[in-house]
């Protein structure tokens, strides 16, 4: 759907105390030399013209997810994650982080050839050239990556629209990338 939509969810007592991060539109009651008085919730955090298209799209996305049932989606992602881990574990030189631990639809890994770490960016680039998109880098968790002692990881993620065949395509592309780097 359209970009630029979000939801701020919190306790009223905290939201009342929280200042808005930007100003404009109906969020302000009064502006004076002595200070600004903000509108009541939720308007206090709605600067500028509301994103009507984004809010409609978000509403429809929520309806869609509710019609499927979030637990069914979670079960599907869990099955895909387990399948992917099994496929990755069968490839020599692939190190899976938190192998056999519960995960939420994503597997982080690195590739070693002859004991030498292949930079995850190189893996991501070669997969991209084959039409497979993964995420590489710190994943907004740089302290963890530093603790692991690696420059980053490769991460493959799954969602509602993925199937086992997508993982098979990813695994075939990864094997080809490893051969190219060997």
What are these regions (language model features)?
Residues 1-182:
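Pyridoxal 5′-phosphate
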């Amino acid at each position: 759907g359209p970009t630029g939509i979000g939801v701020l969810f919190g306790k009223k007592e905290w939201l009342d105390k929280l200042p808005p991060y930007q100003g404009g539109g109906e969020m302000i009651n009064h502006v004076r030399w002595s200070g600004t008085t903000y509108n009541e919730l939720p308007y206090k955090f709605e600067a500028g013209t509301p994103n009507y298209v984004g809010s409609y799209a978000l509403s429809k996305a929520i309806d869609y997810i509710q019609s499927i049932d979030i637990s069914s989606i979670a079960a599907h992602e869990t099955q895909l994650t387990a399948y992917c881990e099994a496929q990755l574990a069968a490839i020599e030189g692939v190190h899976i982080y938190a192998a056999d631990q519960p995960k939420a639809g994503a597997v982080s890994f690195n590739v070693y050839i002859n004991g030498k770490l292949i930079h995850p960016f190189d893996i991501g680039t070669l997969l991209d050239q084959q039409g497979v998109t993964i995420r590489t880098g710190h994943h907004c968790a740089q302290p963890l990556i530093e603790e692991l002692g690696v420059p980053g990881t490769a991460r493959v993620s799954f969602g509602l629209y993925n199937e086992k065949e997508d993982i098979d395509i990813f695994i075939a592309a990864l094997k080809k990338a490893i051969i190219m780097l060997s």
